Amino acid sequence: MSAKRNTKLRHAPLEHAYVDDKSVRRNKRSKQRGRMQDDESVDAPLNEKQAQVIARQAQLQQNEEDVSDSEQTGQPVDIDVPSDDEGQADDLAQPEDAYRHFEIDEHDEVALRAFMPAEPAQRRTLADIIMEKIQGKRTEVASQVSQTGPRELNPKVIEVYQGVGQVLSRYRSGKLPKAFKIIPRLKNWEEIVYITEPENWTAASMYAATRLFASNLKEKMAQRFYNLILLPRVRDDIAEYKRLNFHLYQAIKKAIFKPGAFFKGFLLPLCEAGDCTLREAVIIGGILVRKSIPVLHSSAAMLKMAEMPYSGATSIFLRVLLDKKYSLPFRVVDAVVAHFYRFNADHRQLPVLWHQCLLVFVQRYKEDITSEQKRALLDVLRSHNHYAITPEIRRELVQSKSRDREMPLEESSR
């Protein structure tokens, strides 16, 4: 009885079930390929037919929004947007929680003023950059008209994206205009963005735009967006409100999605400006603490910052990146040692931030430093002493192994 029961199969073999199953979609891959081909076709500049399609879609969407608004009681309604990782605990935290562990007192601010340029260059706001771009574009168009004839945008395209700019100037949440979503696929995307007047965007619009461009632009293009649009807006917001808007805080976190573009277009230009305030450095450094960044991009950024003229922002950003405990190349370690050794002949009072940064570096990479470099750092400690931090730095240097010696420095000197 059991033998008969074993010979009967209740189900067909799995391979036959897969082959014979007619419910499996076999044309999904071709649909995806066709969709990709359609996306690639948008890379060309807009012609008149495409401009009419965009204008029609934008008008339909605007009409739908107007109808829905008229049915309401006049109160703006926020529409929830699906998110990928915003539901995590660290994303729900307020921006102030990220940089609460950075403590800066008045003595640090006084000491850092000695390292600030006597007459810093006037910082350009986002509106200044937009006006400069517009003037440059007018000059370029005038030269093209005199040489090869007019090559301006279609007036319908300009009208559409001016309307998009009006939507973004009051955007809070929900769907972005369809005409705005195709901007990353346009060759003249930068010119189109300036038509929407980014200086008038809301903070929520800036976050949505950063999220869109970080996902769809190439690294060099994203770098330009971070440098020309996002960075000036963040600095303007901090300067005006003494804190960072939550949507801009999230925009910076999304910008780190492309770490190479973020460092080249946002963080390094901020350090090179020479007028980065401690408040800006603390806020942005707090965001870096929470994010995971690839070691290659962080190493290149540390190498560049170590070679820059000193500022308080440099100490904060170096400390944050050093505290991530990367396995750094020896070239980066040597550059950081040279960065600190430059102060051996500098008799100005150094802020506590500098001593804290040196302590973190020695704690994390004491065994990657040569014995000669350790002696050079000990010479620096004789010139610049902090009553609480310097003894700890000296102990870490003396009681640890070196890159070129297995024996601690204090035993080898006996």
UniProtKB/Swiss-Prot annotation:
Cellular component GO terms, alphabetical: cytoplasm; nucleolus; preribosome, small subunit precursor
Keyword field: Nucleus, Ribosome biogenesis
Keyword Nucleotide-binding belongs to the record: no
Protein's UniProt keywords contain Nucleus: yes
Pfam families: Bystin
Entries under InterPro entries matching the protein: Bystin
Compartments, as annotated in UniProt: Nucleus, Nucleolus
Stretch list, region Disordered: 1-91
Cystine residue pairs: none
Biased composition (Basic and acidic residues): 12-24
One GO term (biological process): rRNA processing
Single annotated GO MF: snoRNA binding
Biased composition (Basic residues): 1-11, 25-34
Function: Required for processing of 20S pre-rRNA precursor and biogenesis of 40S ribosomal subunits.
Similarity comment text for this entry: Belongs to the bystin family.
Record-given protein name: Bystin
Protein source organism: Monosiga brevicollis (Choanoflagellate)
Gene for this chain: bysl
